[in-house]
């Protein structure tokens, strides 16, 4: 449940209440803060200050969002056609990050709510942090994906940079984990959240963006229960060359008859496995040439090549994805030590590996994590073909990736409040196989034809029987 809203005094330029002092490390609302070190990498010197607003025409999947209508109305009422701080009303503080603070706000005379990230540039003591502000603003302006935030406006006034983005009322995944028994999630919600995070990382890598700060604290949850990655100040960009190839591979899967008895594509059941060979055409866009020497991220999520300082690429995101999966399942990270230094030693140690105590039906999760936590990035899953290799793993078997946005979020997660939607979810739509659906249609047709030669009452009865069969089939496969 949301906290009771309260409003800050009206202000245009005075944002002193948002500032953090320069004589201490920024506080963080999350349990773990990110670090930033440098191994002689080149810093960006770009620090241009502008006032801009992203156009809804450049954000195709959100162009009909009512938030854009509110933004457009506010811009029409503005003398210069831009969004300013005077158009916003701050409601309450949401959290504090590495660079600034985040507030819940809305546009005046509008119920549309946003998150406003406020950065006091006077409190950023290094050129590196100033560069990170520009990096985050630039990357946010490029994003157009349902599992990533939309930048509605950037506001630069006085020594403040403000980024107006989506508000996620369900908080972050780290806070949600703390509400669960044992600080961990059942396998069905883990598969749901992991699949959406994987798709978000795939999009970033296709844009040539290496994220470098994946952790539950940075996975926000929208009002509909779907994920939204946040905090892009530690990203770096690289060139990427998309490829489209046909390839043959062997895939382990459950038999079709048993798979139809699953309660949902994110559920787990003891099923007979068999091998089948497929030839598929794949699109891949992994920034394999990406390279950086910066040591940035969160200690428990740092990849071995990143800790060593010898340089790293996009593989650090797939290592972090393996740590992310492990934490969702276990409530802790696999290499955590008694201190940050011990954690880093465990990560780079050639003898220290992740320990597992999983049930027999979770062997697929263990296998995926082990392949992601390979300390040699050249052998790590995902480093060659990106997310495509990970999507084919049996852990994600049964997921219809083009329909991922329409799957119903898990309802059994404690503390997750999902806004009801009238839109049908894919977990219901794909529950009946095409063969079974065809059988229902033929059966319905036979009832209708039989009804023409009988009384009207029989016709009505035949229709009711048809809906009975369809409804029964859907109900028997609906996820609990």
Swiss-Prot record:
GO biological process: auxin polar transport; auxin-activated signaling pathway; cotyledon development
Compartments, as annotated in UniProt: Cytoplasm, Cytosol
Key word Cytoplasm present: yes
Gene3D superfamilies linked to this entry: Phosphorylase Kinase, domain 1, Transferase(Phosphotransferase) domain 1
Tree of life domain: Eukaryota
Binding residues annotated for ATP, in chain numbering: 94-102, 117
Matches recorded under InterPro entries: Kinase-like_dom_sf, Prot_kinase_dom, Ser/Thr_kinase_AS
Tissues of expression: Expressed in root tips, lateral root primordia and emerging true leaf primordia.
SMART domains in UniProt: S_TKc
Phenotypic effect of disruption: Enhanced root waving when grown on agar plates.
Active site: 213 (proton acceptor)
Reaction catalyzed: L-seryl-[protein] + ATP = O-phospho-L-seryl-[protein] + ADP + H(+); L-threonyl-[protein] + ATP = O-phospho-L-threonyl-[protein] + ADP + H(+)
Residues annotated as transmembrane: none
Keyword Cytoplasm: yes
GO cellular component term of the entry, any: cytosol
An example Gene Ontology molecular-function term: kinase activity
Enzyme Commission (EC) number: 2.7.11.1
Start and end residues of each Protein kinase domain: 88-396
Extra remark: Over-expression of WAG1 induces a basal-to-apical shift in PIN1, PIN2 and PIN4 localization, resulting in the loss of auxin gradients and strong defects in embryo and seedling roots.
Entry similarity comment: Belongs to the protein kinase superfamily. Ser/Thr protein kinase family.
Protein name: Serine/threonine-protein kinase WAG2
